A protein has these predicted regions:
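Loop/turn-rich, solvent-exposed surfaces of beta-rich toroidal or solenoidal domains
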Residues: 290-317, 322
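Residue position within the beta-strands of beta-propeller blades
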Residues: 62-63, 115-117, 161-164, 213-216, ...
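Surface-exposed, polar helix/loop patches in the mature regions of secreted/periplasmic/lumenal proteins
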Residues: 111, 116-119, 123-126
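Repeated scaffold domains used in trafficking and secretory/extracellular systems
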Residues: 46-56, 91-109, 145-157, 197-209, ...
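C-terminal regulatory/effector modules of DNA-binding transcriptional regulators
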Residues: 162, 204-206, 212-214, 230-232, ...
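Hydrophobic membrane-insertion alpha-helices, especially the h-region
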Residues: 2-13
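Acidic/polar residues in short coil/turn loops that connect beta-strands
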Residues: 58, 76, 110-111, 132, ...
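Surface-exposed loop/turn elements that mediate protein-protein interactions on large endomembrane-trafficking
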Residues: 18-46, 68-93, 122-143, 170-195, ...
C-alpha cells in the first residue's frame, strides 16, 4: 500500500510540473541591463547543493568526509591539509584544517581568501582564512545552526550574503526566511530581504554586476499531491538597496553572461533572453527525464543538471538517469554525460567538471578540454582522505 501511495504522489508531482504549458515568458529587463562582471564569485558551482569544493588559482579546496579542509592539484596529484600551524601533525581537531565544528560541506574561495562558517554557541558565523590556513578572522554572526549544510553563502563586491537554502522546506510551521548581508571589510550585518510563510526556501543566490539574484521556492505535500514551485526570480540592487522581481515564472535556476539571461522554467525547459533586444527563445525543451534543472556556464558551454529532478522522482527515475547535458548558447546539445554513480552534481569551473560518487571522498572529475567527447569519470583521490588519528 505504501509503495502504491508513493508512486501516486510521484506521478501527481510529475503531472503538476509538466502541466505547465510553454508560456509567453515575461522578463523585467530594466533592472538587469549591464549585469555582467568577471566571474570571481564562482557562480558556476551548483548553488542548490553542497559546497564541499571551491576553485583557487591553480588547484582546489575540498572538505573531506572527516571535515578536514585540504588543497589538491589535479596536475601534480598533491593533496595537503590547509594548516600552517607549526609542528601540527594534522591528525586531530586542534589542526587549523579541521572544520568539524562548522556548517558542514560549505567552503568558498573569493578574492584570494577562504570562507567558511564555524558554529559558536549555536550560531553560525562567517569566518575568513588566508590561503595557507595560518590566520583566521571571524567577521560576524549569520544564523542559528545545528551544523547541517543548509546555510549557504554568495559573494558580490565587498559583501557576503548568507541564506538558509532548505531547513524549513516541507515543514508545516511558518518561518521567516532571510538573506543576511555581511561586510567583508568591517563585519557590519544587515538583513536585506525576508519572506514569511510555510515550507519556503531561498535558493540559488548569485551575484552579477550590481545585483544579487535569487529564487524563492515553495513546496506543498498532502496525501495526494506533491508540489514544488518557484515564485520567480528576484534581484537585490546594492546601489539602490531594494529588491525587485525580474520574473514571476516558475524558474528553477538561472545564469547571466554576455548580456544574456539563461533560465530553466520547470515543465518547459531552458530559455535564453537577450537583455539588449528584449527577446526570448526556448533553446532546450524539458522532457520526462530532464526537468527542474540547475544551470552552470563556463564561458564556452552551458551545463544543465537533472540531479534534483531525479532525486525527487527517485522511485521512477533514480540515479540511472542522472546526467549533465552540455549545450552551446544556441541550445545545440554537445554531449550528454552520465552521472549514474553520482551522489551530488557539483558542476565546475572552466577547467574541470565535478561530481561526488557514492563512496567516501569519491570526488570525480572530467577535463573540460575533452568535454565534447568525455564519457569516463576519473577519481581525484585513490582512497579516502583519512587524517584523524593517523
Amino acid at each position: 500500500f505504501t509503495f502504491v501511495v508513493v508512486i501516486i504522489l510521484i506521478l501527481v508531482f510529475y503531472i503538476k510540473i509538466h502541466n505547465n504549458k510553454e508560456a509567453d515568458v515575461k522578463i523585467n529587463y530594466d533592472n538587469i541591463k549591464h549585469a555582467d562582471i568577471e566571474n570571481i564569485a564562482q557562480n558556476y558551482w551548483n548553488s542548490d547543493g553542497i559546497y564541499n569544493i571551491a576553485a583557487a588559482e591553480d588547484g582546489y579546496y575540498y572538505v573531506t568526509n572527516e571535515d578536514f579542509l585540504v588543497y589538491f592539484d589535479i596536475n601534480t596529484g598533491d593533496t595537503v591539509p590547509v594548516c600552517a600551524k607549526p609542528d601540527c601533525m594534522h591528525d586531530n581537531d586542534e589542526c587549523n584544517a579541521c572544520l568539524n565544528t562548522c556548517v558542514i560541506y560549505n567552503i568558498y574561495y573569493y578574492n584570494e581568501y577562504i570562507y567558511y562558517m564555524p558554529i559558536i554557541n549555536g550560531m553560525a558565523n562567517l569566518c575568513r582564512m588566508d590561503k595557507s590556513g595560518s590566520t583566521t578572522k571571524i567577521l560576524g554572526e549569520l544564523f542559528p545552526s545545528d551544523g547541517s549544510s543548509s546555510i549557504h553563502l554568495a559573494f558580490l563586491g565587498d559583501y557576503a550574503y548568507a541564506y538558509d537554502s532548505g531547513s524549513h522546506l516541507g515543514l508545516d510551521t511558518e518561518f521567516t526566511e532571510k538573506i543576511v548581508e555581511v561586510s567583508l571589510k568591517n563585519g557590519e550585518r544587515n538583513e536585506i530581504y525576508d519572506v514569511t510563510g510555510v515550507s519556503l526556501a531561498i535558493k540559488n543566490v548569485k551575484g552579477f554586476g550590481d545585483g544579487l539574484y535569487f529564487n524563492v521556492q515553495h513546496s506543498e505535500r498532502s496525501d495526494e499531491n506533491i508540489s514544488i514551485s518557484s515564485y520567480g526570480l528576484y534581484m537585490y540592487s546594492q546601489s539602490e538597496k531594494n529588491v525587485s522581481q525580474i520574473s514571476t515564472e516558475n524558474i528553477n535556476d538561472y545564469y547571466l553572461s554576455d548580456n544574456y539571461l539563461y533560465y530553466f522554467i520547470n515543465g518547459q525547459g531552458l530559455y535564453k533572453s537577450d537583455i539588449e533586444n528584449q527577446k526570448t527563445e526556448l533553446i532546450y525543451k524539458s522532457n520526462k527525464a530532464v526537468d527542474m534543472c540547475n544551470i552552470s556556464y563556463d564561458g564556452r558551454y552551458l551545463y544543465i543538471s537533472n540531479g534534483k529532478y531525479c532525486d525527487y522522482l527517485r522511485k521512477v527515475l533514480g540515479n540511472k538517469e542522472k546526467k549533465y547535458i552540455v549545450i552551446d548558447t544556441d541550445g545545440k546539445v554537445i554531449n550528454e554525460i552520465s552521472c549514474a554513480d553520482s551522489l551530488e552534481m557539483l558542476f565546475g569551473d572552466d577547467r574541470y567538471l565535478f561530481c561526488m560518487g557514492m563512496g567516501e571522498d569519491q570526488l570525480m572529475y572530467m577535463d573540460k578540454r575533452e568535454i565534447e567527447k568525455a564519457e569516463e569519470w576519473k577519481n581525484i583521490f585513490s582512497e579516502p582522505v583519512h587524517l584523524l588519528g593517523r
